[in-house]
């Protein structure tokens, strides 16, 4: 009885490790490169990174250690892994050692060139680059540092070419002339001696030695007996092993025997090696220097020699490993009584039925709104999934059965189980739904539905909305996004690289401080500069006022100080809030640029989540200043032309676009000048196109009032006091009751004075209503004007906008209107402004960040990739006469028209006296008559003409 061969489980060996090495290199290189490429230093960097926390922290460490050179290892490993896959003989050992050499050299190169990265801590060569560069420069100097790291570049190149330095230099020198070129390629030495002559001299030296090296043991008798016993015991021995004993002497061996004879020790050794001698395991790893004497050949690169004969122990290992790699036999149980061979081979096209729910069942179950696809006849190939589930539950079959590669062996379920599953599913479907069958010849897509199903689904959605205890929570449409994550990279924003050196600043500041003390002393007041604070554009010098002298006397010296210091403007703060000193703000001789990119990069880790915080610039000490629209809640900006007012508005919009997605904030932009805010057209944050018509601006604000009322209704139903609490409750579970999360709405008005001239009272009423009530429902207003007069910034608007920004203005009266005090007239312009906070009594002097038009276009381009804007369903072009007079006032309008028609007097004051109503109501009625064409427009002091 034949015994079954014993099965061996495959074991791990070095050959498998070499085969998987290129895949490991490719995988590691791709992960490292993509992680570095998607790295974002912001607070949401883990979310934006392609490989989550692993990629984020690896990238963070690499950038910190090696700077911009961190991309080098990933690209190198991808290249080496690809070459190894294409060419199996490609050696990786020495080439992998070249990666750290190139990495360290590149960090020094970046440190020398002064490379600046968009990531703050990844500039130049990182920590390692700074350390190496400083050490090399300290030891060898700046020139020696450059030469030394170039030498290491050369060494890394040699390692990459997998050659020794001497061989590489010799090969390069050999190609210089035709005389040496052929000699190096064919193996000639310096004197033109061939390999055979060199070998002959080596053999002669070897024959002079009478003893064989002790690490070689050759016992031919034992070897022959072992080979014979092994071949008899194992009939499946490879033919290569069985023929080793009968192998004919090689050509090289015959030549050597004829030259040196067969009696010498060298000839005996060669014959034993050529026929496969047995080498002891103790010395089996020795590499012989005279490998050219053995039969074999060099590889293509000429560095590795392959022997033709193999030892018996090594050949046995190779044979056993090949047996291990055989796949074991797989078992499959087929029941030919219940399954036919034709059904297994032939695949029938399935017939698909579309199940449509009835209207009566939709009323009972709101959750079932999608049609269900069910097949009437389930072929065998659709039962594979059920078969796998049965096999997983049955532990006995799991240990014994294996899947076959062909389709014939993939049926394990019996016909009774198949029929029972089909009948059970058909019963469930027939009890709940009415089916409609589609023929097999028609292809049905998963998204295909009939007209009746669409109509029923629309009815179900309408009834679901009607079933809510309140009207829709918001009129804002949802954004149809193309991406799952909204992200605008900061690489497109410009950053400054030059900083004013501290020694130069100290010299300049000390000089100005001595001048200030001398000027004040000339007017009879002794004072001393005790401290100074340097900002981007100004430096504040703090003086101790003399005792018994009024502060007004020192503040009156502003013109004299400006004259003797030869500066444009000087601002005196007397006293500094919270201190017993006087502050004199003097412009710097070298003005430091403040870019939006610098501010956003510095504040990435400090910015809180999901709020309307905006960075508005740097104060006089160089610290970042930010505002939160939730706490303001509205902002009023004023300044003359060229003061930086519109640039500040653009920087605030860009900051919101970079940090917040359209699901978190939406914009309404009103730009009568038609040149500032039109850059943001078609971004997904917009609720309506950028408005340039002043008449449409009033209608847009009227829509905002409707949205405000709708939001108040839903917020009050959820028992919330503010908008942030409402959204938090919706996220926690209130969305199950029909509540929806709502985005913030920010309304930007670039030129308020032009709108007030056209719309006047209507616009003021709309702004007043929004500023009074919209804070609690997430609607905020930012208005800018270049003419801060009383007729533009009225008392109601000022009362509801406690937060204000004042850029450079022409007169002190304008500064008092916007800030309620002087100071804005002495500003420097170009982004220099005073900020009045609703929570602080003193003013803060801030330098606004600069953002160019090209940077805005890049930000807008990145934002547009998220999706197209979803505008509100609101027609801005339609007439609003129906909204001016409601149903209750229609009778009042008819009465007023009757008075005008009979008395032939068309004036608001006459209607006010006759109807005993207020002037606003009477003027509104006259405007409505003008819109309907009953009376003519009023031209100057001339009365209106009655047209009907």
From Swiss-Prot:
Biased composition annotated in UniProt, kind: Polar residues: 432-451
Q: SUPFAM superfamilies attached here? A: P-loop containing nucleoside triphosphate hydrolases (SSF52540), Winged helix' DNA-binding domain (SSF46785)
Per the UniProt entry, the disulfide pairs are: none
Taxonomically, which superkingdom? Bacteria
Q: What is its main location?
A: membrane
Q: What UniProt keywords apply to this chain's record, in alphabetical order?
A: ATP-binding, Cell cycle, Cell division, Cell inner membrane, Cell membrane, Chromosome partition, DNA-binding, Membrane, Nucleotide-binding, Transmembrane, Transmembrane helix
Location of the FtsK domain: 622-816
Check the record and name the CDD domains matching this protein.
TrwB_TraG_TraD_VirD4
| Residues that coordinate or bind ATP | 642-647
Q: Which GO terms describe its biological process?
A: cell division; chromosome segregation
* Region of interest (Disordered), residue spans: 389-458
Bilayer disposition of the protein? Multi-pass membrane protein
Localization per record: Cell inner membrane
GO MF terms listed in the record are: ATP binding; ATP hydrolysis activity; DNA binding; DNA translocase activity
The cellular component terms of Gene Ontology attached to this UniProt record, alphabetical and capped at eight, are: plasma membrane
Positions of transmembrane segments: 19-39, 61-81, 96-116, 138-158
Q: Which residues lie on this side of the membrane: Cytoplasmic?
A: 159-948
PANTHER family on file? DNA TRANSLOCASE FTSK, SPORULATION PROTEIN RELATED
> According to its UniProt record, which protein family does this protein belong to?
Belongs to the FtsK/SpoIIIE/SftA family.
Q: Share what the entry says about its subunit structure, partners included.
A: Homohexamer. Forms a ring that surrounds DNA.
Known role: Essential cell division protein that coordinates cell division and chromosome segregation. The N-terminus is involved in assembly of the cell-division machinery. The C-terminus functions as a DNA motor that moves dsDNA in an ATP-dependent manner towards the dif recombination site, which is located within the replication terminus region. Required for activation of the Xer recombinase, allowing activation of chromosome unlinking by recombination.
Domain comment from the record reads as follows: Consists of an N-terminal domain, which is sufficient for the localization to the septal ring and is required for cell division, followed by a linker domain, and a C-terminal domain, which forms the translocation motor involved in chromosome segregation. The C-terminal domain can be further subdivided into alpha, beta and gamma subdomains. The alpha and beta subdomains form the DNA pump, and the gamma subdomain is a regulatory subdomain.
Question: What is the protein's given name?
Answer: DNA translocase FtsK
This chain's source organism reads Leptospira interrogans serogroup Icterohaemorrhagiae serovar Lai (strain 56601)
